[in-house]
UniProtKB/Swiss-Prot annotation:
Pfam families, sorted: Glyco_transf_8 (PF01501)
SUPFAM superfamilies: Nucleotide-diphospho-sugar transferases
Residues at which Mn(2+) binds: 103, 105, 228
CDD domains: GT8_A4GalT_like
Binding residues annotated for UDP, in chain numbering: 9-14, 103-104, 228-233
Organism of provenance: Streptococcus pneumoniae serotype 4 (strain ATCC BAA-334 / TIGR4)
Lineage: Bacteria, Bacillati, Bacillota, Bacilli, Lactobacillales
Additional record remark: Encoded in RD10, a pathogenicity island with an atypical GC content that is associated with invasive pneumococcal disease. Pathogenicity islands account for greater than half the genomic diversity observed between isolates. The main function of this island seems to be correct synthesis and export of pneumococcal serine-rich repeat protein PsrP.
Keywords on record: Glycosyltransferase, Manganese, Metal-binding, Nucleotide-binding, Transferase
Protein name: Glycosyltransferase GlyB
Annotated InterPro entries: Glyco_trans_8 (IPR002495), Glycosyltrans_8_dom-fam (IPR050748), Nucleotide-diphossugar_trans (IPR029044)
Signal peptide residues on this chain, from the entry's feature table: none
């Protein structure tokens, strides 16, 4: 079987994210040769990784990029590292004719055979366009590059990229801008399935780009082959972009389960860590939710999703100390649909105004609603109403409903 060469840039601060990406690849692929371009990752980490990877006929190469001028180059975002420019050096260190470059904030959900089998048709690389709507883009996203290493090597691409960066780093959009300068008309378009960027999920509706949610919706619940966590990252305390739980699934997988290809690798985050008996939700425009903490504490088998069109007060964010709580500030249409699709019952316990006519929406779904007499937004009184002085009775009713 031919070796699949896969390249990452990384620094020591990102090594846990890098390892999560590698874990996801190893779940579905053998005969891998990872190149990790870095200047500060300890050799002990590579020793342990090579011991693990040997089980699946794979290896990892510690490529140290030293004595470089990259630190002086301007970066478009504060959270980016100069290590992003390390991909320029692919033709100098990768021995194989083809390599797949991946950013470390990526998860792979299946076999990579297709990418290593397709014809590059003489192009210098294959990539996915960097588009955030229905208007085609002439630029590619540099987070996933299928590199024609022979072409890069023959053309001395590394030197050319460094020269262009030296000239234009103040105005170009980082390495991506420079790569597009050099290869602007010499790249093959790939389906977005191979670099599915989710960074717009949580901001498109705020910017009025509602078309995004139609264009980027996946059919039949399928996962993209390559998920790219652009924008807010899934390891941050709050991130409403899609597939957060997918990243955490691979992050928490044990290496022994991956290398032995145990059944768990084909399951989900909930099956791996936490599978609630029921899901509930609260749509609110206020931080005041009647007895919310009491309900959370006394219904540990229920997962609570709290959604708002705005950012949350610190008192709501503090509820994240409970493992059965997720909050959705500035929730998106994707969040809305996901919550309603999973909903078992609704809690109408927020004070002040109702959000998005949610009580009627839930009633149309034929889902039960539990409320207090001082928070009910149901003018028809069709919900299960409890006294705010006896929250224990609501807890008892919910337990009975979910079969506890």
């Amino acid at each position: 079987m031919n070796t699949k060469s896969i390249v990452f840039n990384a620094d020591n601060d990102y090594v846990d994210k890098l390892e999560t990406a590698i874990k996801s690849i190893c779940c579905y692929n053998n005969c891998l040769k990872f190149y990790v371009f870095n200047d500060d990752i300890a050799s002990e980490w590579f020793l342990m990784m090579n011991k693990r990877l040997k089980t699946i006929q794979s290896e990892i190469v510690n490529v140290k990029i030293v004595d470089h001028v990259l630190k002086k180059f301007h970066l478009p975002l504060k959270n980016l590292s100069y290590a992003t420019f390390f991909r320029y050096f692919i033709p100098n260190f990768v021995k194989e004719s083809r390599a797949l470059y991946l950013d470390s904030d990526i998860i792979v959900t299946g076999s990579l055979d297709y990418l290593f089998d397709i014809e590059l048709d003489g192009y210098a690389l294959a990539a996915v366009e960097d588009s955030f709507g229905d208007v085609p883009s002439t630029n590619f996203n540099s987070g996933m590059l299928l590199v024609n290493v022979d072409t890069w090597r023959d053309e001395d691409a590394c030197s050319k990229l460094l020269e262009l960066t030296n000239q234009y780093h103040e105005t170009a959009y980082g390495d991506q801008g420079i790569l597009n300068m050099l290869f602007h008309d010499r790249w093959k378009r790939l389906d977005r399935n191979f670099n599915f960027m989710v960074g717009m999920d949580s901001v498109a509706h705020i910017e009025g780009n509602h078309k995004w949610y139609e264009i980027s919706e996946l059919k039949n619940g399928d996962l993209p082959s390559v998920i790219h966590y652009t924008g807010v990252k899934p390891w941050e305390i709050i991130s409403n972009n899609r597939f957060r739980e997918v990243w955490w699934f691979y992050n928490l997988l044990e290496w022994s389960d991956i290398l032995l290809r145990k059944d768990i690798i084909s399951r989900s985050f909930e099956e791996l860590v936490y599978s609630p008996k029921a899901h509930t939700a609260i749509f609110t425009a206020s931080c005041e939710m009647e007895h919310v903490e009491y309900l959370i504490e006394n219904l540990p088998e229920v997962h609570f999703s709290i959604l708002a069109h705005t950012y949350f007060a610190s008192s709501v964010v503090a509820l994240l100390r409970y493992s059965n709580v997720t909050i959705y500030p500035c929730f998106s249409p994707f969040d809305y649909r996901k919550i309603l699709d999973n909903l078992d019952f609704y809690l109408d316990i927020n004070h002040y105004k109702e959000v998005d006519n949610i009580v009627s929406v839930v009633q149309q779904l034929s889902k039960p609603i539990f409320t207090f007499e001082n928070t009910s937004h149901d003018i028809g009184n069709q919900t299960n109403i409890f006294s705010s002085t006896e929250p224990n009775k609501m807890v008892e009713a919910i337990r009975q409903f979910i079969g506890e």
